[in-house]
């Protein structure tokens, strides 16, 4: 099978879209496909060296972070690449390539796939974008839409009138990297000056309002002092909105306790910290701007390191955290979060059981399985998705004409 992927985000830029493109392409190669990835070069001469080490071909086009000015160039690129080779599948990995691939459909007999990740569905509800989608026939009869979760699928179907059988939910996978060797737990705790009896809670996410750091902080302040004094909270991830970051840092300072902002860290160090921690906590909250948590890959990455998760039951998080098996899911309120933190902190047996469940859940969701289901490279009958609460779709209403921020990535980058 000959597969062409087109993505507006890729290495060296960090983000969830780039991770998706890289991992599904590599998995498709492992399953026997011939894969080419078209990705921006970010004006970085060093990308060619890294590309040579990849198991797939990489076609770099001139560009960086997507803007509307790039659309004509992406249309020309999609037309040229789809006409050049006998592709069996042309895959628009993210929304900036939806319209270009749709406009190139006359040049190829290939299957046309488009992956939706969550937030961009709401972003496409402005009058201008809906008109462009309709005029281009973006989701016409040949388009197959792949959603990263059942939540995202339901959200898409609530916004666009497509037959339900043309929109599939295929869960993401976990890179083998996260199952790899970690530094000794005690050594990592000594390196970070973590008390031997401390309960270490770690969060990995960009410091943005919707990731719920303030909700977690408010929850910690509700805990009884003896328990609160035991908890060390390690916050990993780059800064997001400047105003929010300043508010969060000031609130953490005023709250007291052992709260540490570690900033952006390499994956190897994050993996080591996961191995030294007791609990992964990411308590996202509804965002009125229309941004949603389409899946939540970072919960699975923590799970690959035997770490149980605490999350809020919003968006697609319920499909990344198996409630009661790999972690706990609660309402996005400080009171509910505080109760769950206390429950996990005081019950080591529960944490151990959920950690084992988190590892099993992460193992069950591989990138090979994701690629097989997406491209039809292998049987996929064993891919099961948890049921979705359709009322969750209504948590983040988005009216046509509203403007949401541009989509970004995951795992500390979103």
Regions found by a protein language model. Name each.
Residues 41-44, 174, 232-247:
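Glycosyltransferase donor-sugar binding loop
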């Amino acid at each position: 099978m000959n597969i062409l992927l087109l993505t507006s985000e890729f290495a060296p830029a960090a983000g969830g879209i780039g991770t998706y493109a890289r991992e599904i392409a590599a998995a498709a190669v492992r399953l026997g496909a011939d894969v080419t990835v078209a990705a921006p070069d970010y004006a970085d001469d060093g990308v060619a060296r890294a590309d040579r080490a990849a198991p797939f071909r990489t076609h770099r086009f001139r560009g960086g972070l997507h803007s509307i000015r790039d659309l004509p160039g992406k249309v020309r690129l999609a037309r040229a690449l789809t006409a050049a080779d006998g592709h069996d599948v042309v895959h628009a990995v993210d929304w900036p390539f939806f319209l270009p691939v749709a406009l190139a459909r006359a040049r190829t007999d290939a299957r046309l796939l488009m992956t939706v990740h969550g937030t961009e569905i709401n972003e496409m509800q402005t009058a201008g974008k809906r008109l462009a989608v309709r005029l281009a026939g973006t989701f016409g009869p040949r388009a197959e839409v792949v959603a990263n979760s059942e939540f995202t699928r339901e959200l898409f179907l609530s916004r666009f009138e497509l037959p339900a059988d043309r929109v599939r939910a295929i869960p993401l996978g976990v890179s083998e990297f996260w199952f790899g060797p970690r530094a000794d737990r005690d050594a990592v705790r000594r390196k970070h000056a973590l008390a031997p009896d401390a309960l270490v809670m770690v969060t990995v996410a960009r410091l943005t309002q919707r990731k719920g750091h303030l909700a977690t902080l408010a929850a910690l302040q509700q805990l009884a002092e003896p328990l609160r004094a035991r908890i060390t909270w390690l916050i990993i991830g780059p800064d997001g909105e400047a105003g929010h970051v300043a508010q969060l840092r000031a609130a953490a300072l005023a709250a007291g306790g052992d709260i540490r902002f570690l900033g952006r860290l390499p994956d190897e160090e994050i993996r080591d910290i996961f191995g030294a921690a007791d609990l992964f906590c990411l308590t996202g909250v509804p965002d009125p701007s229309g941004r949603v948590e389409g899946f939540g890959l970072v919960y699975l990455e923590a799970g690959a390191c035997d770490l149980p998760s605490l999350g809020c039951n919003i968006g697609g998080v319920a499909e990344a955290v198996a409630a009661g098996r790999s972690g706990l899911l609660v309402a996005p309120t400080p009171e509910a979060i505080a109760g769950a933190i206390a429950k996990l902190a005081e019950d080591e047996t529960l944490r151990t059981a959920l950690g084992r469940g988190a590892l099993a859940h992460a193992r069950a969701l591989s990138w090979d399985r994701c690629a097989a289901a997406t491209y039809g490279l292998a049987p996929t009958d064993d891919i099961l998705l948890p049921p979705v609460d359709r009322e969750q779709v209504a948590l983040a209403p988005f009216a046509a004409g509203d403007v949401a921020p541009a989509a970004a990535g995951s795992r500390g980058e979103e």
